Amino acid sequence: MFGRVFNRSSPIIRLSVRTITSLNGARASVNRPLAKTLISNGNHIFNKKLYLLGLFGITSGYYFTISNGGSAIINDENVNDDASKTVSVDSSISPLPVNYSKNEYSLSNDYSLLGYGIRAVTFLKFKIYALGIYVADEDIKSIAKLFSTSYLSSTFIDTDKSKSHPENVKEALNDPKKSLILIGNLLDSGIKMMAKITPVRNTDFNHLRDGITKTVLNHPNANEKKTELENGLAQLKETLSNKGSVAKNDDLFIELKSNGSLVFTHNNRKKNKAIHLGTVTDPIVGKFLFSQYIGGPKPLSPPTKETVTDKIYSIV
């Protein structure tokens, strides 16, 4: 069901909304686009009730009643039958798990979803892949700690005394220049993360490699770090030198280790097999890649950056 419209002429409307949940306690729920697309011409109570339902992770059926005087548009594309465990990014591929265990796909850590979105080429108007950003469970507390340090707080974050610390963090992360610095500090702290790329159309390793390389080179500081990047990008080329294809709905896992290295794993769904592709040991490649994924002036996937920002806001 997409874009269901209830007109003003309806005297009383009853909506059945099922399996609405939160993303690990985040202020924005897993089905965040659902909450964002509610329009009721001033019926703020309706929107607030939905928000609270998502916040507290209630998954049982629930009914809302809207009296005459407003219209509502509801988009439930992100509502899944098991929404507490997955989030739908695009209907053409499998939903993203909210959690990964290190026992799965030979991953190095247990991970929780930090943000998600679609990577799309705007001028060609087509989607390329779904992007999920995960953080190691043991490092979640480190995010709050980092954004609360006295130096960052006084210099970059808590500059508006009329706002709370979380509100100032969110505003700073939405500032292109501050975001670049704050995310850079986060990545320099040794935080362990993972990016999950799931193509929405058949592709190959050459295209994925070229895309990742371009993403790294588009980092605002890439020009001044060209010499340092050469070795790391050569490693990246070698790691993704496989001439094979990557089918739609396959997964490419990119783990960012505490030392800044990147570990690449291909999940071949047809063969039900996880294949280790290699490691890029130069930390500048990992830092620039994940910086482009979750922050900076020109994020690779704006929806992903937005959901990551919302999650950090809920953590701090």
UniProtKB/Swiss-Prot annotation:
GO MF terms, alphabetically ordered: heme binding; intramolecular lyase activity
Predominant cellular place of this UniProt entry's protein: mitochondrion
SUPFAM superfamilies (UniProt xref): Chalcone isomerase
Record-linked Gene3D superfamilies: 3.50.70.10
Gene name of the encoded protein: AIM18
Protein name: Altered inheritance of mitochondria protein 18, mitochondrial
Cell location: Mitochondrion
PANTHER family for this protein: FATTY-ACID-BINDING PROTEIN 2
